[in-house]
């Protein structure tokens, strides 16, 4: 039996990964992390979607220690979430230091226990947000370290790594879940479900990708299939 664990926030990317994983694996587990994030509504959204989509199990892990250590606009209400700035340089204040290091490591421990061969995460380098822990080289390096430390070949899969946001919408549509992803996920840094607040960086990236996809579905769908190997 093929098993996988999806790092699941209830947002567009991780929900699309879950939808695909349910088609590719016999048993899919979800793990969601409560790190005291400002947009904590995502945890309830993740619970609802994991149940609705048919995950075998869904664990919500308390990692609020991260909140004490990692200062970010996503962990401190005293730091405002910035509006999208297309020319902004450097690492944005929405970056939570160590978040993906912790999430992927804990997901791998869970995968070890449930005998899953893969940990799936929706990180992406194409629409690079300035987060160093979304890079392909980081994921591969951590995967190598975790496999060595557990003496077990647990594979970190990043199905969205080389597709852009428009193609991520195409992937959801390929599996017949575009409306679900659009209306029932929570990507917004301000904790607003669906299309979100419309002005944070996450909402801007999501909306631009959707508009691009809807404006030229055949071309974007073809590009997504070529990059992912889907038919």
Curated annotation (Swiss-Prot):
Binding locations of Zn(2+): 188, 197, 200, 203
Catalytic reactions on record: 7-carboxy-7-deazaguanine + NH4(+) + ATP = 7-cyano-7-deazaguanine + ADP + phosphate + H2O + H(+)
GO-annotated biological processes: queuosine biosynthetic process
GO MF annotation, one: ligase activity, forming carbon-nitrogen bonds
Keywords from the UniProt entry: ATP-binding, Ligase, Metal-binding, Nucleotide-binding, Queuosine biosynthesis, Zinc
Transmembrane segments: none
Highest taxon listed in the record's lineage: Bacteria
Entry EC number(s): 6.3.4.20
Purpose: Catalyzes the ATP-dependent conversion of 7-carboxy-7-deazaguanine (CDG) to 7-cyano-7-deazaguanine (preQ(0)).
Protein name: 7-cyano-7-deazaguanine synthase
Taxonomic classification: Bacteria, Pseudomonadati, Pseudomonadota, Gammaproteobacteria, Enterobacterales
